[in-house]
C-alpha cells in the first residue's frame, strides 16, 4: 500500500510517501520526501525533493499553492525522483489538520461535511486550516476520488475532562466554543505509545508527561494512554514560553496596552506570536541554538531568556504531574526536546525529591528513542524522535477501505 502524507503549515508544505506491505512496529523510512517553502522569495517558492538517494531543488514560478502541490506530486512520477509508475498507484492520502474543534476525537475519512467543518474552524486556526483545505482540494484535482484522511492535532486532547478544558470565565462563553483544545496531539499520542513500547510496559499502566519542545511547544499529561491535561489552550499561544510566542501571560496586560497605548488586536496578535518568547527576551532569535551560543559568549539577555524558558517549562511540568497525581515517565521530543542536551538536563534538575535522576552521560550522547534516566531513577526519562508523518500514515493504514 502506497500512503501519501501531506503536512501543511502556514508558509510551507511537507509531504512524504510510504510503501508498505505490512504495518511495521517502528517508523520506516519514506521512499520519497518533499517540501515547499513559500517564504524564500515573494515571487517564487522553492520545492525540495529527496528520493532514490537524490536531492533536488526546484524554483516554482508561482506562489499559487494548488499549482505548487501539483508540481510537487509530479516529481513522484517523473525525473530522477520518480518512485511510482502512476499517481493512481497511491492508495490513500493522509493530512495533518491543526484544528478539528470539538467535532473529532479521532482520525476521520474526509467527506464534504468534514471539509465544511475544517472551513468553519478557520477563525480558530487562520494560518493553518485554509492551507489544509487547499491541500485536500489539490489532491482532489490531481488524484480524483482517492480516499483522504484527516488527522487532527486537537483530537487526542478531546479526552481532557471539563475541569481542565474549560476556562473560569462566564459559562456562556464556552457555548461559543471558547475552551481549551490543545495541540500537537498527533505527536503527544505517538510519543506516549512509543515510550511504552520501548519500556516494554502496558500503556494503560503509565502516567507520562510528554514535552513537545519545538519552535512551538506544549506539554501533555497522559494517563493510561489518554490525554487528561495539556498546556496549549484555545489557541497555540497559551502555555510554555516558546521560540517567538509568549505563552501564558496575565490577560490584563493586553487590556492595559489597548487602553493606555492604543495597541489594536492585530498588532498584539503579531507581537505575542512572532516577537515574544525567546526572541522577545533575548533580542537575538527564537532559535534555541542561537540562544545557547549567545549564552556561551556571555550575552546576559540570552541567559535570561534561557532561564525563563527553563523556569516556565519546569513549572508546567509540575502542573502536569499534579494532574496525573504521580509520574512514571518524562518524555522529551521535537526539535529542542530531541536535540538540546542542555535543555533536557536543566529541565530534569530539582526533581530528586520525586525520585527522578538523569544519567548525564546518556543525555549527552545524542540519544534517540532511548531512556536517559539513571539506573536508580524511579522516573524514566525518554528521548523520543517524534514521527507525526508516520503517525498519520498509520492512521491511514487502519482506515483504508
UniProtKB/Swiss-Prot annotation:
It catalyses: acetate + ATP = acetyl phosphate + ADP. The gene is ackA. GO terms for cellular component: cytoplasm. GO terms for biological process: acetate metabolic process; acetyl-CoA biosynthetic process. It comes from Microcystis aeruginosa (strain NIES-843 / IAM M-2473). Pfam families: Acetate_kinase. Its EC number is 2.7.2.1. This is Acetate kinase. Keywords: ATP-binding, Cytoplasm, Kinase, Magnesium, Metal-binding, Nucleotide-binding, Transferase.
Amino acid at each position: 500500500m502506497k500512503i501519501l502524507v501531506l503536512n501543511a503549515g502556514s508558509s510551507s508544505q511537507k509531504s512524504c510517501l510510504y510503501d508498505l506491505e505490512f504495518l511495521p512496529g517502528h517508523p520506516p523510512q519514506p521512499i520519497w520526501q518533499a517540501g515547499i517553502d513559500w517564504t524564500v522569495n515573494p515571487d517564487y517558492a522553492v520545492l525540495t525533493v529527496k528520493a532514490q538517494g537524490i536531492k533536488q531543488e526546484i524554483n516554482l514560478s508561482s506562489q499559487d499553492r494548488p499549482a505548487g502541490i501539483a508540481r510537487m506530486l509530479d516529481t513522484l512520477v517523473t525525473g530522477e525522483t520518480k518512485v511510482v509508475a502512476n499517481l493512481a498507484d497511491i492508495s490513500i492520502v493522509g493530512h495533518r489538520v491543526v484544528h478539528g474543534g470539538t467535532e473529532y476525537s479521532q482520525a476521520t475519512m474526509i467527506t464534504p461535511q468534514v471539509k465544511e467543518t475544517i472551513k468553519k474552524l478557520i477563525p480558530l486556526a487562520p494560518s493553518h486550516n485554509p492551507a489544509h483545505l487547499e491541500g485536500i482540494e489539490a489532491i482532489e484535482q490531481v488524484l480524483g476520488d482517492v480516499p483522504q484522511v484527516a488527522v487532527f492535532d486537537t483530537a487526542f486532547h478531546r479526552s481532557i475532562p471539563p475541569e481542565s478544558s474549560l476556562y473560569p470565565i462566564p459559562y456562556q462563553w464556552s457555548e461559543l466554543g471558547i475552551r481549551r483544545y490543545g495541540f500537537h496531539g498527533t505527536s503527544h499520542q505517538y510519543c506516549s505509545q512509543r515510550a511504552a513500547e520501548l519500556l516494554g510496559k502496558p500503556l494503560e499502566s503509565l502516567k507520562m508527561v510528554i514535552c513537545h519542545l519545538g519552535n512551538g511547544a506544549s506539554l501533555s499529561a497522559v494517563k493510561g494512554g489518554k490525554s487528561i491535561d495539556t498546556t496549549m489552550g484555545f489557541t497555540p499561544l497559551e502555555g510554555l514560553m516558546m521560540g517567538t510566542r509568549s505563552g501564558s501571560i496575565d490577560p490584563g496586560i493586553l487590556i492595559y496596552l489597548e487602553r493606555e497605548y492604543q495597541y489594536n488586536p492585530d498588532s498584539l496578535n503579531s507581537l505575542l506570536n512572532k516577537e515574544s518568547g525567546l526572541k522577545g527576551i533575548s533580542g537575538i532569535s527564537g532559535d534555541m541554538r542561537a540562544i545557547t551560543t549567545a549564552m556561551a559568549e556571555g550575552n546576559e539577555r540570552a541567559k535570561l531568556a534561557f532561564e525563563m524558558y527553563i523556569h516556565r517549562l519546569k513549572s508546567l511540568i509540575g502542573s502536569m504531574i499534579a494532574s496525573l497525581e504521580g509520574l512514571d515517565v518524562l518524555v522529551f521530543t521535537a526539535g529542542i526536546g530531541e536535540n538540546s542536551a542542555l535543555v533536557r538536563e536543566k529541565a530534569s534538575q530539582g526533581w530528586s525529591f520525586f525520585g527522578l535522576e538523569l544519567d548525564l552521560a546518556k543525555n549527552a550522547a545524542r540519544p534517540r528513542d532511548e531512556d536517559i534516566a539513571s539506573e536508580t531513577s524511579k522516573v524514566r526519562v525518554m528521548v523520543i524522535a517524534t514521527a507525526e508523518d508516520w503517525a498519520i500514515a498509520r492512521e491511514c493504514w487502519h482506515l483504508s477501505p
